[in-house]
């Protein structure tokens, strides 16, 4: 099999061709736009209900679960965004699988396959926790959330380490830029997740005014840094096209 960037294809057999940048932006814009819509709508039109806490202390921000899963039209908008973006995310995971097979040393290739598997499980867990909300099915939502977080953190760490330590060739400038973003976004994500966990435990233990607001804020940072991390694919596949043809299926090419 030829490397993805050298494959030649017959135009008659090509189903579609598009710049990878468009695919990356589409995969990000749907959940990002849905997330901001849900938070802003909740603050403007469902502030009292979405910021209510079990001990009725002062709170100024809805949690992610409250913003995206408890009220309409937020619930429908978020589900639609996740449903539409899932095929794009799975396509990107497939492209990364090809990328790791060609750019990662043979001795580390299984780790690349594992990273792609974790990415797919993360995507499916996000789908599940979005369609089975905490209000509708708490146990399913909780389990999907645990799987999502575990796979997300493991995937981000493995993706960073594979690109830093396991490559066969030297990083290009745009790949170095992607690697720096991966490192920084992963570190901020882990820190925000730890602080969100601390605020959640403290809120449940003490019911102090404003603590749940910080919990929600750190939740937002976790969500946004996760999206940002996946957006680094924009630089990983800089100036490449996504092609799907009858012979090779889905792959990347410079042509």
UniProtKB/Swiss-Prot annotation:
Name used for this protein in its record: Post-GPI attachment to proteins factor 2
Give its localization. Answer: Golgi apparatus membrane; Endoplasmic reticulum membrane
InterPro entries, per the entry: Frag1/DRAM/Sfk1 (IPR019402), PGAP2 (IPR039545)
Where on the tree of life does the source sit, at the highest rank?
Eukaryota
The protein's role, per its UniProt record:
Involved in the lipid remodeling steps of GPI-anchor maturation. Required for stable expression of GPI-anchored proteins at the cell surface.
Please give the GO cellular component terms listed in this UniProt entry.
endoplasmic reticulum membrane; Golgi membrane
Which key words are in the record?
Answer: Endoplasmic reticulum, Golgi apparatus, GPI-anchor biosynthesis, Membrane, Transmembrane, Transmembrane helix
Membrane topology term = Multi-pass membrane protein
**Membrane in keyword set:** yes
Q: Which residues cross the membrane?
A: 25-45, 80-100, 111-131, 143-163, 185-205, 209-229
The alphabetized list of GO BP terms reads: GPI anchor biosynthetic process
Family affiliation: Belongs to the PGAP2 family.
């Amino acid at each position: 099999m030829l490397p993805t960037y050298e494959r030649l294809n017959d135009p008659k057999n090509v189903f579609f061709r598009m710049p990878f940048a468009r695919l990356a932006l589409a995969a990000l814009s749907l959940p990002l736009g849905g997330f901001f819509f849900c938070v802003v709508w909740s603050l403007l039109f469902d502030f009292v209900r979405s910021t209510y806490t079990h001990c009725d202390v002062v709170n100024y921000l809805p949690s992610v679960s409250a913003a995206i899963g408890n009220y309409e039209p937020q619930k429908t908008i978020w589900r639609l965004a996740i449903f539409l973006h899932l095929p794009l995310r799975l396509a990107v995971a497939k492209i990364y699988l090809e990328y790791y097979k060609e750019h990662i040393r043979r001795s580390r290739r299984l780790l690349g396959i594992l990273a792609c598997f974790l990415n797919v499980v993360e995507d499916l867990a996000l789908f599940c926790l979005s369609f089975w909300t905490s209000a509708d099915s708490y146990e399913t939502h909780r389990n999907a959330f645990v799987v999502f977080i575990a796979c997300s953190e493991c995937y981000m760490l493995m993706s960073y380490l594979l690109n830093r330590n396991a490559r066969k060739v030297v990083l290009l400038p745009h790949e170095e830029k992607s690697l720096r973003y991966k490192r920084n976004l992963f570190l901020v994500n882990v820190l925000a997740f730890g602080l969100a966990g601390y605020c959640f435990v403290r809120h449940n233990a003490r019911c102090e005014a404003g603590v749940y607001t910080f919990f929600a804020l750190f939740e937002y940072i976790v969500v946004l840094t996760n999206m940002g991390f996946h957006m680094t694919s924009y630089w990983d596949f800089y100036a490449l096209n996504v092609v799907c043809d009858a012979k090779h299926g889905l792959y990347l090419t410079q042509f």
